[in-house]
């Protein structure tokens, strides 16, 4: 099975070390463009663009990278409860059309009550997943070309429609990650690819089996992906030394503050990440070559595969054997590590190198009539 390898655009900051200004660098458009172009040339399938108040806006960043890349796809967040599904469908179709079919979407429900309150969202965990399920139903139906009337608990639309369809049919693929039962149910019913953070293989296997069984109950099959950091070097010793350097400027106070911030979230996935290290520096290798040091201060994906190219490739193939076909990777700093992964790891894997998409001709159309419909040819009498 050929593997889809993704990279990451660090719109929330970048540098040589975690938890310090030491070794940091400005993350401006030029720098993000360098990373995107490196990923494009090296054969990555796409890039994940993060979302939230700590990040630049993912949609604007993705749009700005379209003209400077050729094949790279952009995995961009959909935010139920923050954006209406109708507006999100228009945005999604436009990004797909402008990029010639290079748009992918990642459903993000949110997990930090403090950040959500700042965005005007005051739903609890179960309510957010109710809203996300309704959002996704409407979003998908619009992209399928339906005129949608929907009267849910959280979402209400009447006569919603999309005049400009996406390039990818029936719609651009929808990704989603969540560890709670309600999250897995949403994934099983509505999404195309279920993402998990980098837990030990036995825990990942358990999640995959659960989601696969739930999807089968809906008569569906679902793909799987995993989100990991990577520290790959020419030797295993060099890789482990690089891992230790990454957290060499961390102090106990910074770790404690980070763990306190994570504790206020209601994310089951974040709780599972934190349990891998319990906020302590000792015993960070939680599974062969799987290191939890990143999660001491980074929310979300908190584990890294560490080793030389063949060793990391072996670990990746263990995950692939569980049914995972997509790997969303990152490393610090992201420009240099994009090259290291491409040069030291890719030769040891069966990497699916994306082709440059051919321009898709769009149908000629006149100006929309009354802001309501697209004019069609009228038979001449």
UniProtKB/Swiss-Prot annotation:
Its EC number is 1.14.14.5
**Which Pfam families does this one have?**
Bac_luciferase
Keyword vocabulary terms for this entry: Flavoprotein, FMN, Monooxygenase, Oxidoreductase
Q: From its record, what is one biological process in GO terms?
A: alkanesulfonate catabolic process
**GO MF:** alkanesulfonate monooxygenase activity
What is the top-level taxon of the source organism? Bacteria
Its UniProt entry gives the catalysed reaction(s) as: an alkanesulfonate + FMNH2 + O2 = an aldehyde + FMN + sulfite + H2O + 2 H(+)
Q: Which SUPFAM superfamilies match?
A: Bacterial luciferase-like
PANTHER family according to UniProt: ALKANESULFONATE MONOOXYGENASE (PTHR42847), ALKANESULFONATE MONOOXYGENASE-RELATED (PTHR42847:SF4)
Other comments? FMNH(2) which is absolutely required for this enzymatic reaction, is provided by SsuE.
Family label: Belongs to the SsuD family.
Stated role:
Catalyzes the desulfonation of aliphatic sulfonates.
Relate the assembly described in the record: Homotetramer.
Protein's name according to its UniProt entry: Alkanesulfonate monooxygenase
Originating species = Shigella flexneri
Top-level taxonomy: Bacteria, Pseudomonadati, Pseudomonadota, Gammaproteobacteria, Enterobacterales
